[in-house]
């Protein structure tokens, strides 16, 4: 058994009594109340999910296993000559809560290589889809097509003990994750690069191999590592993470759950916003004939968008109340690698004008930029101009966090999710509205 799986087993066995004790001895302790506004309003802030993989503080942003983004990037091992830690080490951190050693990272890299072969039928499925299908449709279809590979589904059918569900779930997670870079890059090259596919180079790490298969030179390998890590997890309540958790709670396996997760991510209020940001900026650039708008000109574009009833993509957040640290990390990368890029300058002018306008408009609870406001700029700069592909990059990253959560869901025996619904008439009655 790999050291990762062995460590995970120890962690799980140590953790289980904590969960059991909370339910048995403290099950009736209240975490909060639910208002009518929350019931109608998408369950905002209702404390009803548990995860130890990441925690989102409204002001500070995300912590992965207790570490802020700068701490995560600083503490995880890096290969010589690169700035960003490997995805392999990050997977170890999310699963176990520990910072891995360099040899732990190598062991996972070897595991990923051994598991990376994508079955031919997956490529056949992708080729059978209309070429103008959205790349998220392709990614989601490829993932669900692989459900027949599920070790969990086989183990369940064979009557595996509940306490061991996590083991085959872990196998599914690692198997799926190892294949995702190849599948994502295949979609890209098939759809946008005249179907010229670049085979994997198994000497490279997760991020490096992805950059290689995309056909984009250094430092895009670091962009890939940074991108997958930053997008991996944002606690459990966001649409993609929650969808993955919900579907898996029915004991649907990793493939079903991750495919559904991707479908949720594909919405314009969630993961599709990074493509929307670039589309919006391109629209402004067209109107400006390529010239960088002044702050006054940009203010007019922002107000025009708001007055036409649209949102400013890349701004606002359901939980965050400050600038997203994922935005900041990418901005620092831009300042280092592409300070003079026109689109980066556009994004900077936007940063100067949008928050004040959203405050003046008085609707958005958070006027600050989120992760999506900056991420497309970097992709565009490195030649990835087909912006409807950006959510696929988000999806590969998000699969890491959602998968780690699902492994722990099974380890701790989290049950089928089943909140209660009420009718409008019942809400009116609770509110004391007389008819
Ligand atoms: N531009 C214009 N209006 C905005 C806005 C924005 N960027 N962000 C919020 N608002 C509006 C909402 O549409 C809502 O209006 P109504 O009352 O007319 O419905 C009002 O402000 C209150 O919304 P909120 O409570 O501040 O935000 P929500 O929790 O409802 O929604 C989010 C959060 C992210 C969907 C929203 O801010 C938004 O639409 N942003 C633009 C899209 C985007 O960047 N999404 C990516 C989020 C990150 C991710 O998940 O990937």
Which residues are covered by each model-predicted region?
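Hydrophobic alpha-helical bundle cores within soluble ligand-binding/oligomerization subdomains
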Residues: 2-435
């Amino acid at each position: 058994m790999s050291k990762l799986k062995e460590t995970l087993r120890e962690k799980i066995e140590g953790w289980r009594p904590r969960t059991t004790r909370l339910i048995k001895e403290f099950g009736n302790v209240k975490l909060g109340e639910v208002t009518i506004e929350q019931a109608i309003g998408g369950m905002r802030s209702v404390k009803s999910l548990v995860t130890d993989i990441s925690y989102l503080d409204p002001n500070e942003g995300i912590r992965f296993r207790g570490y802020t983004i700068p701490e995560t990037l600083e503490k995880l091992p890096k290969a010589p000559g690169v700035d960003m830690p490997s995805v392999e080490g990050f997977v170890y951190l999310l699963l176990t809560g520990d910072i891995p050693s360099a040899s732990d990272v190598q062991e996972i890299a070897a595991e990923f290589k051994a598991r990376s072969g994508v079955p031919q039928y997956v490529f056949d499925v992708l080729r059978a889809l209309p070429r103008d299908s959205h790349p998220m449709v392709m990614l989601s279809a490829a993932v669900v097509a692989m459900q027949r590979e599920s070790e969990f589904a086989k183990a369940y059918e064979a009557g595996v003990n509940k306490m061991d569900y996590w083991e085959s779930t872990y196998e599914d997670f690692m198997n799926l994750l190892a294949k995702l870079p190849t599948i994502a890059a295949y979609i890209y090259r098939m759809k946008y690069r005249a179907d010229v596919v670049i085979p994997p180079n198994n000497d490279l790490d997760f991020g490096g191999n992805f950059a290689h298969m995309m056909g984009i030179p250094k430092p895009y390998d670091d962009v890939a590592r940074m991108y997958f890590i930053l997008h991996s997890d944002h606690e459990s309540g966001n649409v993609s993470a929650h969808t993955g958790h919900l579907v898996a709670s029915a004991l649907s396996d990793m493939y079903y759950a991750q495919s559904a997760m991707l479908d949720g991510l594909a919405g314009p209020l969630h993961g599709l916003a990074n493509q929307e940001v670039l589309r919006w900026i391109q629209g402004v650039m067209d109107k400006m004939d390529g010239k960088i708008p002044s702050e006054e000109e940009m203010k007019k574009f922002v107000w025009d968008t708001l007055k036409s009833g649209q949102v400013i993509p890349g701004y606002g957040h359901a939980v965050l109340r400050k600038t997203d640290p994922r935005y900041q990390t990418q901005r620092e990368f831009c300042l280092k690698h592409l300070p003079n890029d026109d689109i980066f300058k556009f994004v900077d002018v936007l940063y100067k004008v949008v928050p004040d306008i959203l405050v003046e408009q008085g609707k958005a609870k958070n006027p600050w930029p989120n992760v999506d406001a900056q991420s497309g700029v970097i992709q565009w700069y490195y030649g990835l101009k087909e912006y409807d592909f950006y959510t696929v990059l988000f999806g590969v990253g998000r699969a890491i966090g959602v998968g780690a959560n699902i492994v722990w869901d099974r380890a701790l025996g989290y049950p089928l999710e089943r909140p209660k619904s009420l009718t409008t008439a019942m809400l009116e009655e609770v509110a004391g509205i007389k008819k």
